[in-house]
């Protein structure tokens, strides 16, 4: 009942945030704020943003030790490195297929819906500054950055991919050492349970954070920003909705009828990701939801962190729409071959860049330059990026939950055959040491 109440509270907070943000903007700015009124709105938004920032920092505080603990325990109970390699290859195969699905669907929809054609609003000058730091987009630097020089630094920076690399080495070494490393496995199990309990405490703040995040987005920007780019936003959300349907059909194909109940189990983390515009904020709850659904923790603890770097289906859809929308807005014709090559470039360059701030915009900016498109076009979508980030973050959670479920099925089934009742999340009572 507590989990259902929390979901209800988050929905109420979402609606209240929309109303309060909208009313505050209109009451202070009257639709066309003076410099003083704009400063007042910015100050209100700043205080609201503080609440969201605190919540997201508390979530990030949990992620590093939780990823480390669950992954080490999961690898230790796999029993051999062959199983680890098999799960890794199956995960990457699914990630690539899901990315291609997102790109293809996005490409088709952009041509059908034409979100940028005949855009009736002034375009930014082609040389306008975007404040996007492309120096962070260096393929050699990105590949080098995957490997940690210090696990302390990786955890301090909350770099999931580096934590995964260290945890894999640590877990494999524990398996090789055998019984002498058993105390370390028990310590990792205890760490996981403690972090899940902390997650339960932090999530009680979720409704307040959701209210602040949504109100903050509307207080400063106002409702008119949605109207100006409403059709583009509608097109993106149509694409995300169709992607949900297609991923759901694939889940039905590989997981069976139980895939329908998966959406009930992940509804809370999906709602958190949507409201906070952060798939990272939903990571701990997604891990718990998959555990209750029956995905062995040795699978979910490996697939989910990898998915946060390599399986961002919602972000792939958004980048497809944004890139081709900008080309259409400037009246630049790209032949089909160029478009396909550009989208494949997006797919390759987006892998492993999740730790970069505003990662999607960095990838889009670099890709636009490579294909001689005006980088300034990003300014068109920047104003509504937060509202689109809500949808793509929720989609990323759905995509990774389905990925973990499918890989679990490929690895011999989802246990138990009858999922646990949807109840208040807590540290799994069956223990992570039971071979799951």
Predicted regions and their residues:
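Hydrophobic transmembrane alpha-helical segments of multi-pass transport and channel proteins
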Residues: 58, 96-100, 237, 241-242, ...
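Membrane-interfacial loop-to-helix junctions in multi-pass transporters
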Residues: 60-61, 139-140, 158-163, 199-204, ...
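Juxtamembrane helix-boundary/capping and inter-helix hinge elements in multi-pass membrane proteins
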Residues: 76-83, 118-119, 177-182, 190, ...
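Helix-loop-helix junctions within the multi-pass membrane cores of secondary transporters/permeases
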Residues: 268-350, 404, 416-428
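Hydrophobic alpha-helical transmembrane segments of membrane transport and translocation systems
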Residues: 357-423
């Amino acid at each position: 009942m507590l989990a259902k109440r929390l979901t209800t509270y988050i929905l109420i907070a979402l609606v209240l945030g929309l109303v309060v943000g909208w009313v505050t903007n209109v009451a202070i700015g009257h639709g066309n704020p003076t410099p003083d009124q704009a400063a007042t709105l910015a100050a209100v938004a700043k205080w609201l943003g503080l609440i969201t920032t605190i919540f997201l920092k508390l979530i990030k505080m949990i992620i590093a030790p939780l990823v480390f603990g669950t992954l080490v325990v999961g690898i230790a109970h796999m029993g051999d490195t062959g199983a680890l390699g098999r799960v890794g290859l199956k995960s990457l195969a699914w990630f690539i297929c899901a990315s291609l699905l997102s790109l293809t669907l996005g490409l088709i929809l952009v041509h059908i819906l034409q979100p940028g054609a005949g855009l009736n609003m002034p375009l930014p000058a082609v040389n306008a500054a975007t404040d996007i730091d492309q120096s962070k987009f260096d393929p050699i630097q990105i590949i080098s950055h995957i490997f940690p020089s210090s696990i302390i630094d990786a955890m301090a920076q909350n770099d999931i991919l580096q934590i995964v690399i260290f945890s894999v080495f640590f877990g494999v070494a524990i398996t090789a050492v055998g019984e002498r490393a058993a105390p370390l496995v028990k310590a990792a199990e205890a760490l996981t349970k403690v972090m899940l309990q902390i997650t339960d405490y932090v999530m009680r703040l979720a409704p307040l954070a959701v209210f602040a995040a949504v109100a903050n987005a509307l207080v400063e920007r106002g409702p008119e920003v949605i109207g100006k780019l409403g059709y583009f936003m509608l097109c993106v959300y149509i694409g995300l909705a169709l992607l949900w349907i297609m991923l759901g059909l694939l889940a039905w194909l590989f997981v069976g009828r139980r895939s329908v109940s998966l959406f009930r189990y992940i509804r809370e983390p999906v709602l958190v990701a949507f409201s906070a515009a952060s798939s990272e904020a939903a990571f701990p709850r997604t891990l718990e939801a998959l555990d209750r659904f029956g995905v062995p923790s040795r699978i979910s603890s490996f697939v989910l962190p990898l998915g946060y770097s390599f399986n961002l289906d919602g972000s792939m859809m958004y980048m497809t729409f944004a890139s081709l929308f900008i080309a259409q807005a400037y009246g630049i014709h790209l032949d089909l071959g160029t478009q396909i090559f550009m989208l494949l470039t997006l797919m390759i360059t987006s892998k492993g860049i999740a730790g970069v701030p505003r990662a999607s915009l960095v990838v889009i900016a670099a890709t636009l330059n490579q294909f001689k498109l005006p980088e300034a076009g990003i300014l068109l979508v920047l104003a509504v990026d937060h509202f689109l980030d809500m949808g793509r973050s929720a989609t990323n959670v759905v995509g990774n939950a389905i990925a973990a479920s499918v890989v679990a099925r490929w690895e011999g089934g989802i246990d138990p055959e009858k999922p646990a009742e949807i109840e208040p999340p807590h540290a799994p009572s069956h223990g992570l040491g039971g071979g799951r």
